[in-house]
Amino acid sequence: MSILLTTILLTLLTTPTLAQFGFFDQMFGGNGGQQQQQGHHHHHEQQEAQNVRSDSSWYQSQYEGAQCTHYLCPGTLSCVHFPHHCPCAWEAVEDKVELGDGIAICGSKGGWVAGEFEKKVEMARKGLL
């Protein structure tokens, strides 16, 4: 009976540990142990996507390579006639407010009612916020 109890206790103690290692393996780029099962030969055949560089050189090369005869928006790389015509990068979740003098800002809709971002900007400009 003590062997059965020992086996059950060991199973209960090691299962959470194995689950934790699977979590860390997936968090830090592993395939949940699948890479070891597939072998190294298969790993070389499959090309993994790489993250975008963390420095600004990728963005700068995109900016410099963009074709635009008017104004190139720095945030979206859209070509527009005037800087305040630049679209928001995330139009589905951002509203744009023009401040005058060719300046426009984008802000999160944040679940407010339509036009609420513009009202808050106006209140802030008047010093009421």
Swiss-Prot record:
One of its GO terms (biological process) is ERAD pathway. Keywords: Signal. Residues 1-19 form the signal peptide. Residues 32-51 are annotated as: Disordered. The keyword ATP-binding does not apply. Belongs to the LCL2 family. Probable component of the endoplasmic reticulum-associated degradation (ERAD) pathway. This is Long chronological lifespan protein 2. It comes from Pyrenophora teres f. teres (strain 0-1). The gene is lcl2.
